[in-house]
């Protein structure tokens, strides 16, 4: 409880429904919600990546270009600031990605994996401590698409439902309040030994591009084709 209340002193709002509307909120994932009661209030969870972003403790890496991402758990020493952000056309609305595992202060979480937060910052809601009432302004995208406190283990990706993608077209999907299509798909989500990997916008081309060089030994019956070697390639298919 002290950690929760002191976090208010540092500026964080409550994430539970403060008007008791019954709205489904982040629950045990956050110290500012039911997480303050984890392990009979003895082991509150780590501050989320969004909460640490608010404190100025981390600056999440923005995902813009196609890439392959590897994420260590935030509970690992030295990786407390391993987080990513996907922005929308509204500077106050974005998505925060973090890897949560049942270790350290996160030992009593109900689930583990890639947790995706949908943030829509509205100053008046923050000032009135009404962030998560009728609409969720600090929300977890439930991978299994179930808003149920009995299925929290399915909230993270891939989770119990083995959900490996989050795109404009999946359910649940990237669904910003702006109504736009983000064209920022997260695919191939995997969790192996607590490490999360995924591809953003299809992933990076790890092999590189083939660069053709001028042909040599040009004769009536043929020529020698030339190109720069491609890293890790074991063969090439040439169409003439």
Set out the residue ranges of the language-model regions.
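Extracellular hydrolytic enzyme modules, especially secreted metalloproteases
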Residues: 1-109, 119-122
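A detector of low-complexity, intrinsically disordered, Ser/Thr/Gly/Pro/Ala-rich segments
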Residues: 23, 39-41, 46, 149, ...
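A broad, structure-centric signal for solvent-exposed, well-ordered loop/edge residues
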Residues: 39, 104, 123, 219-225, ...
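Hydrophobic beta-strand residues in large extracellular and virion-surface proteins
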Residues: 69-71, 86, 116, 140, ...
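Extracellular low-complexity, Gly/Ser/Thr-rich intrinsically disordered linkers
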Residues: 76-204
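Pro/Thr/Ser/Gly-rich low-complexity, intrinsically disordered linker/stalk tracts
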Residues: 204-232
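Extracellular low-complexity, O-glycosylation-prone stalks/linkers
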Residues: 232-240
């Amino acid at each position: 409880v002290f950690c929760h209340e002191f976090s208010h002193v540092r500026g964080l709002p409550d994430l539970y429904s403060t008007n008791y509307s019954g709205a489904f909120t982040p629950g045990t994932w956050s110290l500012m919600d039911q997480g303050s009661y984890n392990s009979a209030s003895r082991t509150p969870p780590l501050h989320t990546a969004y909460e640490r972003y608010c404190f100025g403790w981390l600056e999440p890496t923005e995902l813009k270009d196609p890439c392959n991402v590897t994420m260590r758990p935030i509970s690992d020493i030295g990786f407390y600031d391993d987080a990513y952000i996907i922005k929308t056309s509204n500077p106050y609305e974005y998505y925060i990605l973090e890897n949560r595992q049942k270790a350290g202060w996160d030992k009593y979480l109900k689930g583990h994996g890639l947790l995706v937060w949908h943030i829509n910052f509205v100053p008046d809601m923050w000032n009135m401590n009404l962030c998560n009432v009728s609409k969720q302004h600090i929300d977890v995208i439930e991978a299994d698409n179930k808003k149920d406190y009995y299925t929290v283990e399915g909230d993270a990706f891939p989770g119990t439902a083995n959900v490996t993608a989050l795109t404009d077209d999946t359910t649940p999907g990237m669904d910003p309040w702006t109504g736009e299509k983000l064209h920022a798909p997260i695919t191939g989500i995997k969790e192996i030994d607590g490490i999360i990997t995924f591809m953003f916008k299809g992933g990076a081309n790890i092999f590189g591009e083939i660069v053709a060089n001028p042909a040599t030994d040009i004769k009536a019956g043929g020529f020698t084709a030339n190109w720069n070697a491609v890293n890790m390639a074991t063969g090439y298919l040439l169409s003439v």
